[in-house]
């Protein structure tokens, strides 16, 4: 996935692992089950907020690590958006809630904040993946928009 930017076939995966394709089906009922397991495993690599930093910094680290993951695995975003399961999204959502716990925001505020942020990050990741050689579009370019988002979130949560 990292080198080709697309989801490989079960046969290609088996060949890379030097195993029979049927061995993969022994552990995964179908390609979608394998994709979900791989995708969740990859998403679990993103920053895990532990509450050691201010919530603003925890959120920034989470977002930038997520974008880096999506940049490093060009086909991952498309795979995740096509999935019917919530596995990968649940990982990000849980970490988002941990990062924002000190904010004491209302549940509706957190849901709206998460929905908005996810859409923004996915749009930014898509732009990076469509222009991989564009040096003017890198993960650090989210600093300004994230700072604005964080200030707005702080104001909204204090209402």
Positions of predicted regions on the chain:
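Short, solvent-exposed positions on alpha-helices
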Residues: 37, 57, 78, 107-112
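DNA major-groove recognition helix of helix-turn-helix
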Residues: 28, 38-39, 114
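Amphipathic alpha-helical packing segments from all-alpha helical-bundle domains
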Residues: 62, 81-116, 122, 136-144
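C-terminal peripheral helix-coil segments that are non-catalytic and often amphipathic
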Residues: 130-159
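Hydrophobic alpha-helical connector segments
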Residues: 47-81, 88, 117
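Amphipathic alpha-helical segments used for helix-helix packing
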Residues: 39, 67-97, 126-130
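Helix-turn-helix
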Residues: 1-33
């Amino acid at each position: 996935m990292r080198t080709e930017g697309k989801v490989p076939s079960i046969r290609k995966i088996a060949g890379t692992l030097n195993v029979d394709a049927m061995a993969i089906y022994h552990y995964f009922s179908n390609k979608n089950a394998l994709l979900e397991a791989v995708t969740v495993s990859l998403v679990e690599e993103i920053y895990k907020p532990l509450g050691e930093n201010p919530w603003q910094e925890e959120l920034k680290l989470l977002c930038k690590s997520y974008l880096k993951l999506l940049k490093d695995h060009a086909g991952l975003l498309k795979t995740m958006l096509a999935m019917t399961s919530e596995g990968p999204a649940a990982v990000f959502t849980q970490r988002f809630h941990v990062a924002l716990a000190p904010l004491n925001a209302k549940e509706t505020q957190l849901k709206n904040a998460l929905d908005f942020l996810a859409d923004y990050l996915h749009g930014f990741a898509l732009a990076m993946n469509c222009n991989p050689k564009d040096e003017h579009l890198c993960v650090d370019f989210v600093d300004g928009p994230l700072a604005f988002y964080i200030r707005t979130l702080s104001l909204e949560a204090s209402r």
